[in-house]
Design a protein with these regions (language model features):
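Cytoplasmic/organellar membrane-interface segments at the starts of transmembrane helices
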Residues: 9, 127, 131-180, 235, ...
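Structural signature of hydrophobic alpha-helical transmembrane segments
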Residues: 42-58, 105-110
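Alpha-helical transmembrane segments and their membrane-interface junctions
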Residues: 30-38, 182-204, 274-286
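Short helix-boundary/re-entrant hairpin motifs in multi-pass inner-membrane proteins
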Residues: 1-50
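Membrane-interface alpha-helices at helix entry/exit sites of multi-pass transporters
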Residues: 9-19, 162-168, 211-233, 257-261
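Alpha-helical multi-pass transmembrane bundles of energy-transducing inner-membrane proteins
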Residues: 9, 66-141
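Hydrophobic alpha-helical segments of multi-pass membrane transport proteins
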Residues: 58-59, 112-121, 224-251, 255
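Interfacial segments of multi-pass membrane proteins
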Residues: 5, 32, 85-97, 184, ...
Length: 286
């Protein structure tokens, strides 16, 4: 229900819903670590296997959902599910270093998903031109491919046969493209932004539960290795899904006017992504 509900709402409401989703995740983390910490005696780490298992299933569901989605708002909704599953699975281990990494990753992923909701609304409005069909429903998205999806020989990819060098890119289109790229980097955990820093901290904590300076014999168990592989695999699937969407919306044939972007529409996106960059610059050892 989450993805259809978030996608049906307006872009600002969808962005706020993404924020509220992570508030729920933080509530679970806060209460669970308070009531069932490793020092809670007989109830220590109660339900940890449920958190780890449920989080991993949520990660897989979110990644597969992103791979099967073509609308940007659906991609953003499944990205919220994917990041929430990552946080829940990491929280279930009850490790200090892993918790530190997820606490850094939590605001970063939240800001990026919220920015993606806002960016998706502007991109859809530009690409659809007010029509009732979505960009992926057009049959001429790739006129340079034949029926076998192979590039046609001798075809000039510029339909107007103009020189490709020196063509002007509208400022609004460039800003939308840049915002989409930054969201993609943070959500998928690619360097050099905060998504990579948070995921790297969690992966490092999984491989070295007691820290990099700990002695040998502290290798992760089966749940740790499973989460390690899932984090890398789901990041790859998310990258494929978002890259495919970016190619469809920014590189496909589009006949229409340049996007119109008002300052008040771009400021929230810029502020959210600026916070992600700030998190990157202020990252440090725990």
């Amino acid at each position: 229900w989450l993805v259809p509900a978030y996608s049906a709402a307006t872009a600002p409401v969808g962005a706020l819903f993404a924020l509220m989703t992570k508030v729920g995740v933080y509530t679970i983390l806060r209460l669970w670590t308070l009531l069932f910490s490793s020092e809670a005696g007989a109830s220590a780490l109660f339900g940890s296997l449920w958190l780890i298992g449920g989080g991993m299933v949520t990660m897989a569901f979110g990644a597969v959902g992103m791979l099967g989605s073509q609308r940007l708002t659906h991609l953003a909704g499944f990205a919220a599910i994917l990041s929430s599953g990552t946080l829940l699975a990491a929280a279930g281990f009850g490790q200090n270093l892993l918790t530190a990494g997820l606490l850094y990753y939590l605001p970063s992923s939240t800001l990026a998903v919220s920015a993606l909701f806002l960016t998706a609304d502007l991109i859809d409005r530009w690409r659809n031109d007010g029509a009732s069909y979505a960009p992926f429903e057009r049959s001429d998205n790739a006129p340079f491919l034949n029926a076998e999806l192979v590039p046609t020989e001798g075809l000039n990819l510029d339909e107007d046969e103009e020189v490709l060098i020196g063509r002007v890119i509208p400022a609004a289109a460039a800003l939308l493209g840049l915002a989409f790229i930054v969201c993609t980097l943070v959500i998928t955990g690619l360097p050099p932004l905060s998504g990579f820093v948070g995921k790297f901290a969690m992966l490092s904590a999984l491989l070295n539960p007691l820290g990099l300076t700990a002695s040998a014999g502290t290798q992760p168990g089966a749940p740790g290795w499973t989460l390690f592989v899932l984090m890398i695999a789901t990041g790859l699937l998310a990258l494929i899904a978002l890259s495919r969407a970016g190619i469809r919306h920014f590189w496909s044939t589009h006949v229409g006017v340049a996007p119109q972007l008002r300052v008040l529409e771009g400021l929230p996106i810029a502020a959210l992504l600026a916070l992600c960059i700030t998190l990157t610059l202020l990252a440090g050892p725990v």
